[in-house]
Amino acid sequence: MANDIDELIGIPFPNHSSEVLCSLNEQRHAGLLCDVLLVVQEQEYRTHRSVLAACSKYFKKLFTAGSLASQPYVYEIDFVQPEALAAILEFAYTSTLTITASNVKHILNAARMLEIQCIVNVCLEIMEPGGSVGEEDDKEEEDEDDDDEDEDDEEEEEEEEEEEEDDPEDFADQENLPDPQDITCPQSPSKTDHLTEKDYSDTPRDFPDSFQPGSPGHLGVIRDFSIESLLRENLYPKANIPDRRPSLSPFAPEFFPHLWPGGFGAFAQLPEQPMDSGPLDLVIKNRKIKEEDKEELAPPPPPPFSSDFFKDMFPDLPGGPLGPIKAENDYGAYLNFLSATHLGSLFPPWPLVEERKLKPKASQQCPICHKVIMGAGKLPRHMRTHTGEKPYMCSICEVRFTRQDKLKIHMRKHTGERPYLCIHCNAKFVHNYDLKNHMRIHTGVRPYQCEFCYKSFTRSDHLHRHIKRQSCRMARPRRGRKPAAWRAASLLFGPGGPSADKAAFVMPPALGDVGGHLGGTAVCLPGPSPAKHFLASPKGTLSLQELERQFEETQMKLFGRAQLEAERNAGGLLALALAENVAATRPYFPLPDPWAAGLAGLPGLTGLNHVASMSEANN
């Protein structure tokens, strides 16, 4: 029976819920199928009971208290403002809350009375000290503009460069997230002062000790994202580190006094700088994030290279100057001691550039694909890849996108905007990676190389296409030309080539000592038949002038072929000129001409010897 039952196939429609809400909103504006009328200060609002009950616990209790027949059609509400109720109704049908700085308190009071918790949370977050409506809108836009994962190789490089600039904003969003447990209770205003844009630009941001404690409006310690700062805030995995000072004190009196040179004085005394022990203030891009941790933190340790640092670690050291190094072995042992691996957990970390660049980011795991998403607020965008939801629609062609930055790039097709400009030829591009590929034309950089034939390409898709063809891994037959001796011998035959009844021409033994590539007493070459040879004359007689003319034509053919070959190989007149200069030292005939030797004994043909030895370059 189980085999007879077909498997159920679920086909999701991600846009169905939004389309239903849009249809209900159109019915509300048109007054169709509305089953309740809300009256607030003589203003009427026609709506649907089911939508109100789904959004508000107050309306759910009101509409489900009795039977449907006994419930009235008109409800008059006197505890909310008309603007607040209109904004809440718009939120119920469009999932968008439109507020201003003037009516945020009225909307908060109405949401509390109607028991709409999500609106209460948003209004409380906006009304916190240091926040405003404009900053909330900017934060939402920045969250949408941050790229989370790569769709291809080129976009990955572009998004990594953008994340280098936008990472502090992600951390700011993480710190600004409200606690769900404490969201309902009103929070007390912060006691810390607010930074203006001018104060922030004039404030050093690298190290905590760069503040002047006596200056007015002191803001305490600015977080430098070092490991020491993270350990104090429990944001970095803390290892079992023993106490530093007692563990190093036994080594000091026995090891260090005799290792230092006598002329090296003690470290200069630095005055202690009193630090405020208030909560840490995080200032990022003209934004001050309120710390949720109310505990007062201890002041940071003094600078690592101060004399107080060594005094605290080595209390038993004498106050006088240190003695000289006694032997080279002591100096080597001293270096080995300082480079020991176990001291890595004892000495405090130095403020290196790599540690200052360490930026903690919130991480969330996808419940579907179990992928870890780095950055606060990026998990909902990742979930759209599974649900297929595309909330951002183009107003011109109605194409939908999952991310707002993709919609902005798509809108450039309609507006014609090309923000990326080439500095060499003023060419404009829509995408950043298109500009990078274009710049390689000017720079000549080919970063993508084939591992089989070592051919380089400017774009990665060109390399993938080359590898997919597998043209560099196939053994193809050699298509080169025949050797020069074979080409020279082929000119001795007619246009149709040698006939089937070709004879063999034997080189006389006297030519074996002539310079060339052949050695031996006799060499057998394919010879033409008497009827097809160019020396054969139909008249039976041949003059010396005609032989010289035909031989010069043969030399011109050789020169023409060599010229074409040089142009094809070198690809220019300069290479051809160089080839002529090289060819002057080497004749084109590596073999002696057998016909000159064969005709040397004929009467009246003695003047042909100097013509036969003439090379192509001399011609």
Swiss-Prot record:
Pfam families: BTB (PF00651), zf-C2H2 (PF00096). The keyword Repeat applies. SUPFAM superfamilies: ARM repeat, beta-beta-alpha zinc fingers, POZ domain. Residues 34-101 form the BTB domain. GO terms for molecular function: zinc ion binding. GO terms for biological process: negative regulation of cell population proliferation; positive regulation of fat cell differentiation; positive regulation of transcription by RNA polymerase II. Residues 129-219 are annotated as: Disordered. GO terms for cellular component: nucleus. A zinc finger (C2H2-type) spans 364-386, 392-414, 420-442, 448-478. Disulfide bonds: none annotated. Residues 134-173 have a biased composition (Acidic residues). It comes from the Eukaryota. InterPro entries: ARM-type_fold, BTB/POZ_dom, SKP1/BTB/POZ_sf, Znf_C2H2_sf, Znf_C2H2_type, ZnFinger_BTB_dom_contain. Residues 191-208 have a biased composition (Basic and acidic residues). Signal peptide: none annotated. Keywords: Metal-binding, Repeat, Tumor suppressor, Zinc, Zinc-finger. May be a tumor suppressor gene. This is Zinc finger and BTB domain-containing protein 7C. The gene is Zbtb7c.
